[in-house]
């Protein structure tokens, strides 16, 4: 064995002693990342997961879980507002969007706690921050609570998910929000223009309309929910119009 090879081996040993070394490092704690980490740990690997913000991913924190909780509240509000007589309900009822929002966060946080429990149960190291590759076997944490930490690994799984795609010339901020900002707001606006009549846009429209918000949906295609069957689009458009939602199809926006 040559001196250069011996030096490389010594260097690797020193790195493992002075830094945290793992069989598997997972970038991203969404459903792809944390499930992969659990499986690797079950197979006997030493595993770490690096996550900069949302343990459990977008779905659990600011996506399908809190949105479905809000939809349930909106469904209850709709029943009182539009179907009370059919259920034998009478009297004045008020609806507090802030309470609905608080419930949605509680539901979300409860499930996220479950993700942390699974990490602990499977002896997976949690690292909070943004991971950046220093080389093919090293990641440095450049942001977050564990900023400055360096880890080395034998294998890395990249499960970083995606980011919101904005419209050309549009910057998120102020009264222009993405789904993420909106789902974290604890107050309902007086009015809202929703660009896009896909599933996310239609869900927000239903929630807000049932809490008295003046909602307008702008859609480039010729119908709402354009990826669904035409019969579905037709029926849901009819129901939304009954709610007072304005639907503008075959339309563009200019800001």
Report residues per predicted region.
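Glycine-rich flavin
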Residues: 20-22, 38-45, 50-188, 216, ...
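N-terminal Rossmann-like FAD-binding beta1-loop-alpha1 element of flavoenzymes
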Residues: 24-48, 204-209
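Conserved phosphate-binding and hydrolysis motifs of nucleotide-dependent enzymes
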Residues: 28-33, 161, 196-201
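Rossmann-like NAD(P)H-binding beta-loop-alpha module
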Residues: 187-220, 227-228
């Amino acid at each position: 064995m040559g001196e250069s090879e011996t030096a490389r081996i010594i260097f690797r040993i020193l790195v493992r002693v002075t830094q945290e070394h793992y069989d598997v490092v997972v970038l991203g704690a969404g459903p792809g990342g944390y499930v992969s980490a659990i499986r690797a740990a079950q197979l006997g690997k030493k595993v770490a997961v690096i996550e900069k913000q949302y343990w459990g991913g977008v779905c659990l924190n600011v996506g399908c879980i809190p949105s479905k909780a809000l939809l349930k509240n909106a469904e209850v509000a709709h029943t009182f507002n539009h179907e009370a007589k059919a259920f034998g309900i009478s009297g004045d009822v008020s609806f507090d969007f802030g309470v609905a929002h608080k419930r949605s966060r509680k539901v979300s946080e409860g499930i996220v706690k479950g993700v942390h429990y699974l990490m602990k149960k499977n002896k997976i190291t949690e690292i909070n921050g943004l991971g950046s590759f220093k080389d093919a076997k090293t990641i440095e944490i450049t942001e977050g609570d564990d900023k400055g930490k360096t880890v080395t690994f034998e294998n890395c799984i990249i499960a970083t998910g995606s980011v919101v795609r904005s419209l050309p010339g549009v910057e998120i901020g102020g009264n222009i929000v993405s789904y993420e900002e909106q789902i974290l707001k604890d107050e309902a606006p007086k009015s809202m223009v929703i660009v896009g009549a896909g599933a996310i846009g239609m869900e927000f429209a239903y929630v807000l309309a049932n809490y008295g918000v003046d909602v307008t949906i702008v859609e480039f295609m010729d119908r709402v929910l354009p990826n669904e069957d035409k019969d579905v689009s037709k029926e849901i458009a009819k129901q939304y119009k009954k709610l007072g939602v304005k639907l503008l199809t075959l339309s563009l926006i200019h800001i």
